[in-house]
């Protein structure tokens, strides 16, 4: 991404929602942006796998995991799948695992923390629903921009491809 989130905030403050600063970088790509696809779940990453199995086409998967600190919702295998399928990044309101391996994968990954335990796989979760966490509300089709300084979300694309 050629335009930093700080510049987007300077130029488009009225059009942006800025996430509270609680996310850490884990992926091999720190700067990423794209249209949003959402999943909402709790301690079951089946919907994450389902989404990342599809062609990403430069999208960002926003995972509302309820902020759980009891298991990981993304690891190296799912991140590699997302990278292979053309996703720009994943933002997890929850934990990830395999952090050393995640750092080697060319995919943006931001999450609250790490946890070694994998999630359950019961197939429970919602797709393309409105989610609210980190002080903002996000809808499928919004545009997310992430870099070293934070995460901002807009209703429409703010940068030229």
Swiss-Prot record:
Keywords: Lyase, Metal-binding. Its EC number is 4.1.3.17, 4.1.1.112. A divalent metal cation binds at residue 98. Gene3D superfamilies: Ribonuclease E inhibitor RraA/RraA-like. InterPro entries: RraA, RraA/RraA-like, RraA/RraA-like_sf. Substrate binds at residues 75-78, 97. Homotrimer. This is Putative 4-hydroxy-4-methyl-2-oxoglutarate aldolase.
